[in-house]
Each structure stands twice: as C-alpha cells, then as structure tokens.
C-alpha cells in the first residue's frame, strides 16, 4: 500500500502548518529494516515490495527537499540517529528553520527517528513515527525521550505499532504538539509497504 499520499495529507492537515510554498521544507525519510538487508526491488515474503522510491518522489512532488538514503546492513539506530542530527544541525547552521524540518520514520526508521527526537532535543523539530512503538519499549528502550512536534501513526492490527501515549507521558522534553492516528486497514505491519 502506498503510504506516501496518506503521510502527505496527514502532514499538512494535522499538527504541522504548511506555509508559503516558496519556503524550503525538509524531510528526512528513514525506511524500515527490510530494506537494510534487501534490494529496493526485492519482495518481502509477506508484504510485497517496499515503495521507497515512490514515497520519496511523492514528497518531492509536494515541494519538500528530501534527504534519505537506503541504509545497508543492520545499522545501530542510535548511532545512525547521530548522523541524521549532524545533517539537521548543518541545515540549521545554514539558515533552515527547525520548524521546517521533519523526520519521518517507518518501523525501524521510526525508532531511528525517535532517537533523533531524543538526542537533538529540539522542541521546534517535527517528527512522524510510523509503526514504531511497542508497549515493552518503555522498559527495553528507556533512554527514548520524545522532543518536538510529534505525530504517531499505527495500524490497529500491527504488533509492531501501538499507541505511544505512555511514551509521550514519560518524556521530559517539551512537546508542543502531539497527535496520534490509529489506522484500521487490517494489513498489520504490511501497511508500511
């Protein structure tokens, strides 16, 4: 299922203001774990092909400058987040407004995005976490501390994505805006493909 249109609509219609089209807006898109160890054209045995290129293209067609790469190997989420933060800091140092920067992650990419939120500790950045929270995360990954404007999206039938309200309530950083969307597609974790 192509989630790019859904993300674009949600992005503009929920917690983030879409400003003047002449202003540069940046998206860091962080894909799921499957693509770390498989080629872009390989089919997931249960969910089919990941529409990575289509998602990037949709964001670009909507006027965003997209920063994304296909990760290779089983990368460490925290370490990769530090690399993303370096890029974000560079954009800000060159005049980009933090509120025009959004980090979007699906599944493992969502966990990387959560680390970016934590380690960047910038309440003006925007984040969309998709299918990337389990109830055990509070105990298993206690260092995550949401910071920024947060939108979470999860599928009701997906065991790898549930409500993040508990994480939000346990976070100590300022969260200006928080919205959560529960989908009911019946596709489980496959809705991110």
Would you name each region that the model predicts?
Residues 126-190:
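The feature captures the conserved acid-bearing segment of alpha/beta-hydrolase catalytic domains
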Residues 112-116, 138:
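Hydrolases whose catalytic domains are alpha/beta-hydrolase-1, hotdog thioesterase
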Residues 56-75:
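Conserved alpha/beta-hydrolase
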Residues 103-113:
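Gly/Ala-rich beta-loop-alpha elbow adjacent to hydrolase catalytic centers
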Residues 50-55, 73-96:
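Alpha/beta-hydrolase active-site loop
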Residues 1-23:
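Bacterial Sec-dependent N-terminal signal peptides
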Residues 21-58:
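Short, surface-exposed "cap/lid" segments of acyl-processing enzymes
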Residues 115-125:
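Conserved hydrolase catalytic core segment
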């Amino acid at each position: 299922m192509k989630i790019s249109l859904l993300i674009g609509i949600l992005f503009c219609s929920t917690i983030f203001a879409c400003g003047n089209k002449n202003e540069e807006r940046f998206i860091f898109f962080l894909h799921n774990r499957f693509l770390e160890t498989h080629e872009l054209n390989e089919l997931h045995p249960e969910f089919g092909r990941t529409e990575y290129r289509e998602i990037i293209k949709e964001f670009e067609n909507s006027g965003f400058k997209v920063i994304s790469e296909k990760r290779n190997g089983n990368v460490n989420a925290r370490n990769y987040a530090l690399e993303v933060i370096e890029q974000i800091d560079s954009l800000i140092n060159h005049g980009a407004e933090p509120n025009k920067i959004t980090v979007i992650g699906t599944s493992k990419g969502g966990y990387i995005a959560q680390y970016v939120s934590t380690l960047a500790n910038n309440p003006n950045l925007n984040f969309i976490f998709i299918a990337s929270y389990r109830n055990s995360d509070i105990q298993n990954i206690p260092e995550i501390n949401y910071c920024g404007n947060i939108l979470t999206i999860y599928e009701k039938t997906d065991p790898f994505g549930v409500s993040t309200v508990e994480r939000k309530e346990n976070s100590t950083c300022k969260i200006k805006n928080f919205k959560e969307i529960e989908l009911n597609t019946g596709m489980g974790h496959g809705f991110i493909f």
